[in-house]
Amino acid sequence: IFTAFSLLFSLFIFLLTRKPKSKTPNLPPGPPGWPIVGNLFQVAGSGKQFFEYIRDLKPKYGSIFTLKMGSRTMIIVASAELAHEALIQKGQIFASRPRENPTRTIFSCNKFSVNAAVYGPVWRSLRRNMVQNMLSPSRLKEFREFREIAMDKLIERIRVDAKENNDVVWALKNARFAVFYILVAMCFGVEMDNEEMIERVDQMMKDVLIVLDPRIDDFLPILRLFVGYKQRKRVNEVRKRQIETLVPLIEKRRSVVQNPGSDKTAASFSYLDTLFDVKVEGRKSGPTNAELVTLCSEFLNGGTDTTATALEWGIGRLMENPTIQNQLYQEIKTIVGDKKVDENDIEKMPYLNAVVKELLRKHPPTYFTLTHSVTEPVKLAGYDIPMDTNVEFFVHGISHDPNVWSDPEKFDPDRFLSGREDADITGVKEVKMMPFGVGRRICPGLGMATVHVNLMLARMVQEFEWFAYPGNNKVDFSEKLEFTVVMKNPLRAKVKLRI
């Protein structure tokens, strides 16, 4: 019945949307699909997560293949060599973004953000501002005090959580709070002592991510005539609440900038300070409040989920591997003694850095990079890559490729210490793993994220010994996609205070 309905539905859509024939590009191979809807219903009816569907196609179709997802043509790049060719060797051509669906256009203010902007003057201006004026090593040092406060809050929250729940804690919830605390301070220049307010802002940001989830009419736009009214209404409600929540924080910071010394508790600098008068090529005025909301949301969302979920996976792996956890703890004790780990210490900890690198290899934040598109028609592996095609780089597949890694399913930090294997996560010379993307669209917050993960993991291991809950060292590593790749069942852990 499902197949018959799908075929009839495909015919209906075909009659509505058929266009004159044009020269057919030589696309990479892929599974045969139905007219108009392509492989959309095959993916939806497979019972698999999208990354599992892609992973299972790779043995048959190789390292580059095509899916037709309704009106979208999606080209999957699933090898390290082709990722390097596209994003490094042909980086300028592959540096753009495809058209957005209407929901994303609303939240990106028509692509006015670092991640969403097409390759051009808006992207150059916004990215240059973020990298040079906010995420440079010297700027990051200015927020060290906020990171230290957040680390202490993290440890205290875990202590309280453990005391109230027979030594059992939620790993993600506490880590996420600490990361969000840091990013709110960096973005708005305020130290939020009101934990309820922080959690309210955080929940609002989660709601934004939820409404950004793809819908059937994103792939078949003709369906917007018939479905999606309630979802579109929900989108507008969430956007309205997003603006109402963040604009007061924006205006408060604007007042501080315009009246120096008026707020003794305000930070000397914030991301917003760089945005009020940012010069964007081709524009005479600075960003509107709605655009500032978009840029601030990008900063908060981009840094919170990737870091917090990495820590949850990291704690899970240490619980599964007590020997690795103990070796990490001994390194911490050797380097810092009884004092608290700080940012200078983590640079002297090769095993910590190996653990985090292996964590990012085994559990990259997303299955795919943010979608790329090309600025002009180009060939890759002998196939045509047309403009306005969605090019998806299979991050998870690359970091688990047995042709690149020995025993890729094993969590093994020693692979980075023995000289047996190594990888530059920027991918400049060679791509072996790309947790933050590579090339011109590499995540601008890479340096900040690695500092946060290293520091927080070190503090959590220094203060507590972590055990699986319930016991026997069994950890459920089932996963699902919620903007980032998270544990399907949020991690609960039993902790024992060390000091």
UniProtKB/Swiss-Prot annotation:
InterPro entries reported for this sequence: Cyt_P450, Cyt_P450_CS, Cyt_P450_E_grp-I, Cyt_P450_sf
Enzyme class: oxidoreductase
Keyword tags: Heme, Iron, Metal-binding, Monooxygenase, Oxidoreductase
Taxonomic superkingdom: Eukaryota
Cofactor field: heme
Enzyme Commission numbers on file: 1.14.-.-
Binding site for heme: 443
UniProt entry tagged with the keyword Oxidoreductase: yes
A GO term, aspect molecular function: oxidoreductase activity, acting on paired donors, with incorporation or reduction of molecular oxygen
Family: Belongs to the cytochrome P450 family.
This protein's name: Cytochrome P450 77A1
Annotated organism of origin: Solanum melongena
UniProt lineage: Eukaryota, Viridiplantae, Streptophyta, Embryophyta, Tracheophyta
